[in-house]
Amino acid sequence: MDLRTLWDQHRAAAWPKFSSSSEGELMTLDTVISGCATYYFDERSLDAPRLLMLGHCLDDLDMLLPDVPEETGEYFTRLRTLAGLLLDAARTT
């Protein structure tokens, strides 16, 4: 799946309903990654601070994903895939 299609799917998805001690952190990661995606599609690139921030988001998601409730797995796995594709695309531009 290409980056644009995945981004469109993610934007159309509703925030999952769940209760977790990580919910606030996951919401922040979703917001930051979405902001990077918006910037990338507007500018066709990411600057160095955003690349660094996106890398940290991926690290944080990798730590949190094993503990997200099963019913939210699709949403956050898609977010993780989106961040990885975005980072790869930005590094090649």
Q: Predicted regions: what is each one?
A:
Residues V68-T93:
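Amphipathic alpha-helical binding modules
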Residues W7-Q9:
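Short helix-onset patch at the extreme N-terminus, typifying the N->h transition
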Residues R11-D59:
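Amphipathic alpha-helical interaction modules
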Residues D30, G55-L58, D62, T77-R80, ...:
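Generic structural concept
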Residues Y39-R44, L61-V68, A90-T93:
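Secondary-structure edge/capping motif, primarily at the C-terminal ends of alpha-helices
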